[in-house]
Design a protein with these regions (language model features):
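Conserved "right-hand" nucleotidyltransferase catalytic core of DNA-directed polymerases
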Residues: 1-22, 26-32, 139-344, 355-357, ...
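Conserved DEDDh/DEDDy metal-dependent 3′-5′ exonuclease domain
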Residues: 3-175
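Short active-site loop/helix that positions an aromatic residue
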Residues: 62-73, 85-92, 260-268, 364-379
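Short hydrophobic beta-strand that contains or immediately precedes a catalytic carboxylate
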Residues: 78-79, 358-362, 561
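Function-dense linear segments that define catalytic or interfacial modules
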Residues: 152, 320-400
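Conserved catalytic core of nucleic-acid polymerases
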Residues: 200, 204, 392-519, 530, ...
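Polymerase palm active-site segment centered on the conserved acidic dipeptide of motif C
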Residues: 218-253, 430-432, 436, 441, ...
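Short, contiguous acidic/charged loop-to-helix segments that flank catalytic cores in large enzymes
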Residues: 305-312, 328, 360, 379-381, ...
Length: 573
């Protein structure tokens, strides 16, 4: 056991394959202590140390925590150096070399898989830091595992990097109206670290699928499971034929937008493009358009969520698994295997086994509420105290609710044409602080000026300056990056809030037979027993109140969620 490590204190851990654990921590005088513990069962040792309640520090959850999660160990607290490097320095990588370099103000190094350089070869084999300050690529490739002393030195370097990161996030401004004891960027670093751990857990646990229900849905939508490529092609032609039968003339390739536009002209429908939203108004009066739109839904399922998807991504234990990421460019979580875009038609199959249920919570109007908090707009914050904030916005704008919703969304996404244009003028008059905040972000994007989200994530727009300078300030490129920045400061902050909420829910579920099984931008799914569902629902809701109390501190913004207990995801309304 590491001597002197208290609850919540950083404890760097490196798993040495076949040898044990390397640990590093600070003693009472601030010095770094390190040791290697030889053990045939490092996971069991971590579980023992977990009783002390340390904040585990690792280079990345994917590299260290995956083995712990697979063995049933769910750490309570962690600091993920890779995740914090993405937050603090705006990195697109989270490997040890990039995180170390960023923490020390060095240029981002090449990935360690490349050829060794003269600087790598010039040093001694045990020189972990090169003459230029970068980490040795031999060590990045795993040379630290050669002996116990090297492994403990690697853990000490990990702890040093964490300390530099903590100093960095604590130095960032806390933009809340009422700051707390711990600055918001530091709290964001903690929740981003937990999100990286949660991503590993989501990959391990998977999403429960009722295979019989799924197979019935797929059969009804795209046809029986094909036994050959010929059968698959025949099923595709059969789906196409349903649409062709509704139109006069020869069949066309329904996957070619230009040909589909010509096809629509045969029934008197002239449209500039064939996007589904543009065709939907015609569906009620035109059976041909209705058939085309139904075909598109079936085609999407067939090509993205068909039989091959089910065979590839759903395990023998009837769990849908994909690769999860804790943050993309603006901070949102990502997932493969279609987890973030599962069609509504297939959601009845997201259903745990008998005796278990899903607690589903959907954040209400989260991005507009976040805009109210991060912009400091008192009038918009007042609207955000209501269950439905679009209702008071409509009254303030003198419009109906649908127009008010369009105006708020258009403001965040930079839309200025159509019905949004007139409504935006009223937004400027009624919510000047929110609109000024969005315009400032857009201008920064157009000029290639770095931004930080409310929680401290660096959006590295300065890397675009050469491109923007060549294109010009009024170019399509400049407008595109401006709109990206305008939305990213809201969407990124909303992602930070969501992950802070998810981390709080995860902590609240400790000891319960319950696991988070899906994170979907503004929606959370927790699988639990029917007996514990009510208590778990209470944890989810109290976690949102708790998170909102410090994340929105002083803004007056209220967060709301629609929480329900359901047997399948489709039952949630």
């Amino acid at each position: 056991m590491p001597e002197g490590v208290g609850a919540g204190e950083p404890l760097a851990v490196v798993v040495v394959p076949g040898r044990g654990l390397a640990l590093a921590w600070r003693d009472a005088d601030g010095g770094i202590r390190r040791e290697h513990v030889a053990t045939a069962d490092p996971v069991a040792l971590v579980a023992d140390i977990e009783t002390l309640g340390p904040r585990w520090v690792w280079w990345s959850a994917r590299g260290t925590a995956a083995a712990l999660v697979a063995a049933g160990v769910r750490p309570r607290a962690c600091w993920d150096v890779g995740a914090v490097a993405r937050l603090l320095h705006g990195l697109s990588r989270d490997d040890a070399g990039a995180a170390w370099a960023a923490a020390h103000g060095l240029a981002e190094p090449p990935l360690p898989e490349g050829e060794l350089t003269l600087l790598d070869l010039a040093g001694e084999a045990d020189d972990v830091v090169r003459a230029d300050g970068q980490l040795s690529r031999e060590w990045l490739r795993g040379a630290w595992a050669a002996d116990p002393d090297a492994a403990s030195r690697w853990a000490a370097l990990l702890l040093q990097t964490q300390a530099l990161q903590e100093t960095g996030v604590r130095a960032l401004p806390d933009r809340r109206a009422t700051a707390g004891t711990s600055p918001l960027p530091y709290l964001t670093a903690l929740s981003e670290s937990m999100a990286a751990l949660l991503a590993v857990e989501l990959e391990h646990d998977g999403l429960p699928i009722d295979r019989a229900v799924l197979e019935a849905l797929l059969t009804a939508t795209v046809g029986p499971r094909p036994r050959s490529e010929a059968e698959e092609a025949a099923a595709r032609r059969a789906r196409d034929a349903v649409v062709w039968a509704r139109f006069p003339g020869e069949p066309v390739d329904l996957r070619n937008p230009a040909l589909v536009r010509d096809l629509l002209a045969r029934v008197g429908i002239d449209v500039p493009d064939t996007r589904s939203w543009r065709l939907e108004p015609y569906a009620e009066s035109s059976p041909a358009v209705a058939a085309l739109l139904a075909w598109r839904k079936a085609e999407r399922i067939a090509t993205t969520y068909g039989w091959s998807w089910a065979e590839r991504d759903i395990g023998a234990d009837d769990r849908l698994r994909g690769v999860w990421g804790a943050s993309e460019g603006a901070g949102r979580m990502t997932a493969s295997a279609g987890l973030h875009n599962l069609p509504a038609e297939l959601r009845p199959a997201v259903r745990p086994r008998e005796g278990r249920v899903l607690v589903r919570a959907d954040l209400g109007q989260i991005e507009p509420r976040v805009l109210a908090a991060v912009s400091g707009d008192a009038a918009l914050a007042a609207a955000a105290r209501e269950d439905d904030m679009y209702a008071p916005v409509a009254r303030a704008l003198g419009s109906d609710r649908p127009t008010a919703k369009v105006a708020v969304l258009a403001a965040m996404y930079g839309q200025t044409s159509g019905p949004a244009g007139a409504a935006l003028k009223d937004m400027d008059r009624t919510y000047p602080s929110a609109m000024a905040f969005l315009r400032a972000a857009e201008e920064a994007g157009r000029r290639g000026v770095d931004l930080r989200t409310y929680g401290g994530r660096l959006l590295r727009l300065s890397t675009l300056r050469d491109v923007l300078a060549e294109a010009g300030p009024e170019s399509t490129v400049a407008h595109s990056y401006g709109r990206f920045a305008r939305n990213a400061v809201v969407q990124g902050a909303a992602a930070e809030l969501f992950k802070a909420w998810a981390a709080t829910v995860r902590a609240g579920l400790a000891g319960a037979d319950a696991r988070i099984v899906l994170c979907l931008h503004d929606e959370l799914l927790v699988e639990t027993t029917a007996a514990e569902a009510s208590r778990v629902g209470g944890i989810v809701e109290s976690s949102l109140r708790s998170t909102g109390s410090w994340w929105c501190a002083g803004s007056g913004v209220r967060l709301v969620a629609d929480t329900s207990v359901v047997r399948s995801w489709a039952d949630a309304k």
